[in-house]
Protein backbone atom coordinates (compact mmCIF):
# COMPACT_ATOMS: atom_id res chain seq x y z
CA UNK A 1 0.00 0.00 0.00
CA UNK A 2 1.17 3.55 -0.66
CA UNK A 3 0.06 7.16 -0.49
CA UNK A 4 -0.39 9.32 -3.58
CA UNK A 5 3.25 10.41 -3.40
CA UNK A 6 4.46 6.82 -3.28
CA UNK A 7 5.22 6.69 0.44
CA UNK A 8 4.43 3.27 1.93
CA UNK A 9 1.50 3.00 4.33
CA UNK A 10 1.36 0.14 6.79
CA UNK A 11 -1.04 -1.06 9.46
CA UNK A 12 0.48 -2.54 12.58
CA UNK A 13 -0.74 -6.13 12.57
CA UNK A 14 -1.03 -6.39 16.38
CA UNK A 15 -3.03 -3.18 16.73
CA UNK A 16 -2.91 -0.86 19.74
CA UNK A 17 -5.41 -2.27 22.20
CA UNK A 18 -4.61 -2.45 25.93
CA UNK A 19 -3.55 -6.11 25.77
CA UNK A 20 -0.98 -5.29 23.07
CA UNK A 21 0.63 -2.56 25.13
CA UNK A 22 0.63 -4.75 28.25
CA UNK A 23 2.33 -7.55 26.32
CA UNK A 24 4.93 -5.19 24.85
CA UNK A 25 5.61 -3.56 28.21
CA UNK A 26 7.00 -6.88 29.50
CA UNK A 27 10.00 -6.48 27.22
CA UNK A 28 13.24 -5.07 28.61
CA UNK A 29 16.47 -3.83 27.08
CA UNK A 30 18.49 -6.50 28.89
CA UNK A 31 16.14 -9.25 27.79
CA UNK A 32 15.73 -8.23 24.15
CA UNK A 33 18.94 -6.44 23.16
CA UNK A 34 21.75 -8.59 24.51
CA UNK A 35 23.49 -8.38 21.13
CA UNK A 36 23.68 -4.58 21.46
CA UNK A 37 24.48 -4.09 25.15
CA UNK A 38 28.27 -4.68 24.89
CA UNK A 39 28.47 -1.72 22.50
CA UNK A 40 26.73 0.77 24.80
CA UNK A 41 28.57 3.25 27.00
CA UNK A 42 27.51 6.07 29.28
CA UNK A 43 26.78 9.33 27.48
CA UNK A 44 25.62 7.89 24.16
CA UNK A 45 22.67 9.41 22.30
CA UNK A 46 20.20 6.69 21.27
CA UNK A 47 17.12 6.62 19.05
CA UNK A 48 14.60 3.83 19.62
CA UNK A 49 12.47 3.54 16.48
CA UNK A 50 9.01 2.09 17.10
CA UNK A 51 9.41 2.39 20.86
CA UNK A 52 5.91 1.20 21.71
CA UNK A 53 5.07 1.57 25.42
CA UNK A 54 8.68 2.45 26.21
CA UNK A 55 9.94 -0.36 28.44
CA UNK A 56 12.97 -1.09 26.23
CA UNK A 57 13.60 2.62 25.65
CA UNK A 58 13.65 3.31 29.38
CA UNK A 59 16.11 0.47 29.92
CA UNK A 60 18.41 1.98 27.30
CA UNK A 61 18.19 5.38 29.01
CA UNK A 62 19.20 3.83 32.33
CA UNK A 63 22.19 2.12 30.71
CA UNK A 64 23.63 5.17 28.89
CA UNK A 65 22.73 7.88 31.44
CA UNK A 66 23.39 10.78 31.34
CA UNK A 67 23.21 10.26 27.57
CA UNK A 68 19.91 11.25 26.00
CA UNK A 69 17.51 8.67 24.57
CA UNK A 70 14.60 9.40 22.23
CA UNK A 71 11.70 7.00 21.74
CA UNK A 72 9.86 7.40 18.45
CA UNK A 73 6.50 5.88 17.55
CA UNK A 74 3.80 6.65 15.03
CA UNK A 75 0.94 5.87 17.44
CA UNK A 76 -0.05 8.48 20.10
CA UNK A 77 -1.45 5.84 22.49
CA UNK A 78 1.92 4.12 22.61
CA UNK A 79 3.67 7.40 23.36
CA UNK A 80 1.24 8.26 26.15
CA UNK A 81 1.91 4.89 27.78
CA UNK A 82 5.67 5.35 27.36
CA UNK A 83 5.62 8.79 28.98
CA UNK A 84 3.66 7.44 31.96
CA UNK A 85 6.11 4.58 32.44
CA UNK A 86 9.14 6.89 32.26
CA UNK A 87 7.56 9.14 34.87
CA UNK A 88 6.82 6.16 37.14
CA UNK A 89 10.43 5.00 36.79
CA UNK A 90 11.75 8.56 37.37
CA UNK A 91 13.93 8.39 34.25
CA UNK A 92 14.77 11.94 33.15
CA UNK A 93 17.27 11.48 30.29
CA UNK A 94 14.53 10.44 27.89
CA UNK A 95 11.85 11.94 25.68
CA UNK A 96 9.24 10.57 23.30
CA UNK A 97 8.23 11.92 19.91
CA UNK A 98 5.72 10.99 17.25
CA UNK A 99 7.05 10.20 13.78
CA UNK A 100 7.65 7.69 11.01
CA UNK A 101 10.78 5.61 10.48
CA UNK A 102 10.55 6.67 6.82
CA UNK A 103 10.88 10.37 7.73
CA UNK A 104 12.72 10.70 11.03
CA UNK A 105 12.18 14.20 12.48
CA UNK A 106 15.86 14.75 13.32
CA UNK A 107 18.85 16.37 11.61
CA UNK A 108 21.53 14.16 10.13
CA UNK A 109 24.25 12.77 12.40
CA UNK A 110 22.22 13.19 15.61
CA UNK A 111 22.58 9.79 17.30
CA UNK A 112 25.32 7.33 18.24
CA UNK A 113 22.97 4.34 18.16
CA UNK A 114 19.60 3.61 16.55
CA UNK A 115 17.46 0.63 17.53
CA UNK A 116 14.60 -0.99 15.62
CA UNK A 117 13.26 -3.91 17.66
CA UNK A 118 10.52 -5.92 15.91
CA UNK A 119 9.72 -2.86 13.79
CA UNK A 120 10.99 -3.37 10.25
CA UNK A 121 9.06 -6.64 9.99
CA UNK A 122 5.96 -4.46 9.76
CA UNK A 123 7.06 -2.08 6.99
CA UNK A 124 6.88 -2.62 3.26
CA UNK A 125 10.21 -0.90 2.50
CA UNK A 126 12.89 -1.84 5.07
CA UNK A 127 15.62 -0.48 2.79
CA UNK A 128 14.10 2.99 2.81
CA UNK A 129 13.74 2.85 6.59
CA UNK A 130 17.37 1.77 7.07
CA UNK A 131 18.63 4.53 4.80
CA UNK A 132 16.77 7.02 6.95
CA UNK A 133 18.18 5.45 10.12
CA UNK A 134 21.67 5.69 8.65
CA UNK A 135 21.10 9.39 7.87
CA UNK A 136 20.54 10.29 11.53
CA UNK A 137 23.54 8.30 12.80
CA UNK A 138 26.87 9.98 13.46
CA UNK A 139 30.09 8.78 11.80
CA UNK A 140 30.93 5.47 13.45
CA UNK A 141 27.33 5.16 14.63
CA UNK A 142 25.58 1.82 15.06
CA UNK A 143 22.18 0.48 13.99
CA UNK A 144 20.77 -2.49 15.93
CA UNK A 145 17.94 -4.43 14.29
CA UNK A 146 15.95 -7.43 15.55
CA UNK A 147 13.12 -9.14 13.69
CA UNK A 148 11.46 -12.57 13.60
CA UNK A 149 11.77 -15.15 10.85
CA UNK A 150 8.20 -16.36 10.61
CA UNK A 151 8.67 -19.53 8.51
CA UNK A 152 10.53 -21.10 11.45
CA UNK A 153 7.90 -20.22 14.05
CA UNK A 154 6.73 -23.50 15.62
CA UNK A 155 4.06 -24.27 18.19
CA UNK A 156 2.61 -27.57 19.36
CA UNK A 157 0.09 -29.09 19.60
CA UNK A 158 -0.79 -28.03 16.07
CA UNK A 159 -4.53 -27.67 16.46
CA UNK A 160 -6.85 -26.72 13.62
CA UNK A 161 -7.45 -23.32 15.20
CA UNK A 162 -3.76 -22.61 15.73
CA UNK A 163 -2.88 -23.60 12.18
CA UNK A 164 -5.68 -21.43 10.81
CA UNK A 165 -4.56 -18.48 12.91
CA UNK A 166 -1.02 -18.81 11.53
CA UNK A 167 -2.37 -18.73 7.99
CA UNK A 168 -4.50 -15.66 8.64
CA UNK A 169 -1.74 -13.79 10.49
CA UNK A 170 0.60 -14.31 7.54
CA UNK A 171 -2.04 -13.11 5.10
CA UNK A 172 -2.64 -9.96 7.13
CA UNK A 173 1.09 -9.22 7.39
CA UNK A 174 1.58 -9.58 3.65
CA UNK A 175 -1.56 -7.56 2.91
CA UNK A 176 -0.12 -4.78 5.06
CA UNK A 177 3.03 -4.79 2.93
CA UNK A 178 5.32 -6.70 5.29
CA UNK A 179 7.52 -9.70 4.55
CA UNK A 180 7.68 -12.90 6.60
CA UNK A 181 11.22 -13.66 5.44
CA UNK A 182 13.07 -10.35 5.02
CA UNK A 183 15.01 -10.79 8.29
CA UNK A 184 17.37 -13.39 6.78
CA UNK A 185 18.50 -10.70 4.32
CA UNK A 186 19.30 -8.09 6.96
CA UNK A 187 23.04 -7.98 6.28
CA UNK A 188 22.47 -7.40 2.58
CA UNK A 189 19.83 -4.74 3.22
CA UNK A 190 22.06 -2.92 5.70
CA UNK A 191 24.91 -2.87 3.20
CA UNK A 192 22.61 -1.62 0.45
CA UNK A 193 21.43 1.12 2.82
CA UNK A 194 25.01 2.37 3.06
CA UNK A 195 26.34 0.83 6.25
CA UNK A 196 30.05 0.08 6.01
CA UNK A 197 30.17 -3.10 8.11
CA UNK A 198 27.55 -5.53 9.35
CA UNK A 199 27.08 -8.54 11.61
CA UNK A 200 24.08 -10.85 11.99
CA UNK A 201 23.07 -13.83 14.09
CA UNK A 202 20.09 -16.12 14.39
CA UNK A 203 18.61 -16.83 17.78
CA UNK A 204 15.53 -18.37 19.27
CA UNK A 205 13.22 -18.11 22.25
CA UNK A 206 11.79 -21.27 23.76
CA UNK A 207 8.12 -21.36 24.67
CA UNK A 208 8.20 -24.60 26.62
CA UNK A 209 5.34 -26.29 28.42
CA UNK A 210 5.23 -24.78 31.89
CA UNK A 211 6.81 -21.45 31.05
CA UNK A 212 4.61 -18.41 31.49
CA UNK A 213 5.34 -17.35 27.90
CA UNK A 214 3.88 -20.58 26.57
CA UNK A 215 0.72 -20.03 28.59
CA UNK A 216 0.44 -16.42 27.50
CA UNK A 217 0.83 -17.13 23.79
CA UNK A 218 -2.57 -18.77 23.24
CA UNK A 219 -4.23 -15.88 25.04
CA UNK A 220 -2.35 -13.47 22.77
CA UNK A 221 -3.82 -15.43 19.86
CA UNK A 222 -7.28 -14.94 21.34
CA UNK A 223 -6.78 -11.21 21.69
CA UNK A 224 -5.27 -10.93 18.22
CA UNK A 225 -8.31 -12.32 16.41
CA UNK A 226 -10.50 -9.94 18.42
CA UNK A 227 -8.26 -6.94 17.71
CA UNK A 228 -10.20 -4.51 15.46
CA UNK A 229 -7.51 -3.86 12.81
CA UNK A 230 -6.73 -7.56 12.38
CA UNK A 231 -10.36 -8.64 12.37
CA UNK A 232 -11.42 -5.88 9.98
CA UNK A 233 -8.74 -6.82 7.45
CA UNK A 234 -9.59 -10.53 7.53
CA UNK A 235 -13.31 -9.91 7.12
CA UNK A 236 -12.91 -7.24 4.44
CA UNK A 237 -10.72 -9.55 2.38
CA UNK A 238 -13.09 -12.48 2.84
CA UNK A 239 -10.38 -14.73 4.27
CA UNK A 240 -12.55 -15.95 7.15
CA UNK A 241 -15.98 -15.48 8.65
CA UNK A 242 -16.94 -14.01 12.01
CA UNK A 243 -17.73 -17.53 13.17
CA UNK A 244 -14.28 -18.83 12.19
CA UNK A 245 -12.53 -16.01 14.06
CA UNK A 246 -14.72 -16.58 17.11
CA UNK A 247 -13.88 -20.30 17.04
CA UNK A 248 -10.15 -19.51 17.03
CA UNK A 249 -10.58 -17.19 20.02
CA UNK A 250 -12.72 -19.71 21.90
CA UNK A 251 -10.09 -22.45 21.52
CA UNK A 252 -7.32 -20.43 23.20
CA UNK A 253 -8.09 -21.04 26.91
CA UNK A 254 -8.09 -24.82 26.48
CA UNK A 255 -4.84 -24.63 24.51
CA UNK A 256 -3.25 -22.58 27.29
CA UNK A 257 -4.07 -25.35 29.79
CA UNK A 258 -2.48 -28.14 27.75
CA UNK A 259 0.42 -29.95 29.44
CA UNK A 260 2.10 -30.67 26.10
CA UNK A 261 2.57 -27.05 25.03
CA UNK A 262 5.83 -26.43 23.25
CA UNK A 263 7.07 -23.86 20.80
CA UNK A 264 9.90 -21.62 19.73
CA UNK A 265 10.35 -18.35 17.89
CA UNK A 266 13.34 -17.76 15.60
CA UNK A 267 14.67 -14.23 15.17
CA UNK A 268 17.55 -12.45 13.47
CA UNK A 269 19.68 -9.79 15.14
CA UNK A 270 21.88 -7.52 13.06
CA UNK A 271 24.32 -4.67 13.62
CA UNK A 272 25.35 -2.12 11.02
CA UNK A 273 28.12 0.46 11.43
CA UNK A 274 28.34 3.81 9.68
CA UNK A 275 31.77 4.67 8.29
CA UNK A 276 33.85 6.87 10.60
Predicted regions and their residues:
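A short SAM/SAH-binding and catalytic strip from SAM-dependent methyltransferases
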Residues: 112-125
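Class I SAM-dependent methyltransferase SAM/SAH-binding core
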Residues: 8, 45-49, 53-103
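Conserved catalytic/acceptor-binding region of the Class I
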Residues: 144-213, 221, 225
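A short glycine-rich, Lys/Arg-flanked "PGG" loop and its adjoining helix->strand segment in the class I
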Residues: 127-142
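C-terminal helical/coil "lid" or tail adjacent to the Rossmann-like core of SAM-dependent
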Residues: 12, 18, 201-263
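Conserved alpha-helix/loop element of class I SAM-dependent methyltransferases that forms part
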Residues: 25-44, 59, 63
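A short acidic, Gly/Pro-enriched loop at the edge of an enzyme's catalytic core
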Residues: 102-113
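Class I SAM-dependent methyltransferase Rossmann-like catalytic core
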Residues: 4-28
Amino acid sequence: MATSDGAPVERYVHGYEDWTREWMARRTASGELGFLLPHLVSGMAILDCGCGPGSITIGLAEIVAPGQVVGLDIEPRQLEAAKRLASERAVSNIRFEQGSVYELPFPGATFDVAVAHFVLEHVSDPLRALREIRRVLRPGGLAAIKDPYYPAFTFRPETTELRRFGELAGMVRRHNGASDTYAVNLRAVLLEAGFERTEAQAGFENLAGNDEAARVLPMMLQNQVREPAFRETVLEQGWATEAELDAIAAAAPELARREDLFGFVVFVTALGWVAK
